């Protein structure tokens, strides 16, 4: 196996190309898969109204030299849902709502022009047995003639068992919470938390604790 720690934008690809060529000779029936979990901070809605880093938002553009160098059979992309909204920004570094998705559409078309079919899904981790409800974008590019297949869910929010489905109920996070571990008090820290962090903690207390003990226990004992 090869491991690189260099910046993907400037990585010298010769060792990778040589490794892929040798692998194709040794395992002629194997598929070469290029997986890219592109940095998502500057796409995510968690960024709020803050300016975006334009360079971070163009990391997907750097995939093309990998595609052209190793000619993968599959390219698989994982990112936040907002990746599909990738588009130009104004001078203040904020996305232009009128051109939302423009760069994403162009990028998908450019990858497809290298001989790939494409499909995507928005998948929820909870639907596959994770202890968190987290949606993510998954895109698959496949060389023409190769199938594009997404996994079938194993769980759903309320559970479903009938002639057509056998889906377990979402797993409640309480199963993996250690409520005996209270952590370290924010009031005894040597370094004071930032104002933004304190604001987030306060918002969480209002949302999840302010209703009182009974309301909190109801939340804890449910999957909502």
Region locations from a protein language model:
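SAM cofactor-binding core of SAM-dependent methyltransferases
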Residues: 1-10
């Amino acid at each position: 196996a090869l491991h690189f720690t260099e910046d993907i934008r400037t990585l010298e690809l010769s060792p990778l190309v040589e490794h892929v060529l040798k692998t194709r000779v040794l395992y002629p029936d194997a598929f070469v898969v290029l997986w890219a979990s592109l940095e998502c901070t500057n796409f995510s809605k968690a960024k709020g109204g803050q300016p975006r880093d334009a360079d971070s938002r163009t990391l997907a553009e750097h995939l093309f030299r990998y595609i052209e160098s190793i000619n993968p059979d599959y390219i698989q992309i994982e990112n936040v849902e907002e990746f599909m909204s990738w588009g130009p920004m104004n001078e203040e570094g904020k996305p232009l709502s009128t051109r939302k998705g423009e760069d994403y559409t162009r990028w998908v078309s450019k990858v497809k022009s290298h001989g790939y079919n494409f499909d995507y899904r928005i998948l929820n981790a909870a639907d596959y047995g994770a202890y968190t409800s987290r949606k993510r974008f998954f895109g698959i590019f496949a060389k023409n003639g190769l199938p594009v297949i997404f996994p079938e869910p194993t769980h759903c929010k309320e559970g479903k068992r009938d002639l057509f489905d056998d889906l377990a109920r979402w797993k409640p996070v309480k199963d993996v919470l250690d409520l005996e571990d209270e952590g370290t008090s924010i009031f005894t820290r040597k370094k004071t938390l930032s104002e933004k962090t304190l604001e987030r903690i306060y918002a969480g207390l209002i949302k999840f604790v302010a209703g009182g003990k009974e309301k909190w226990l109801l939340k804890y004992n449910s999957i909502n």
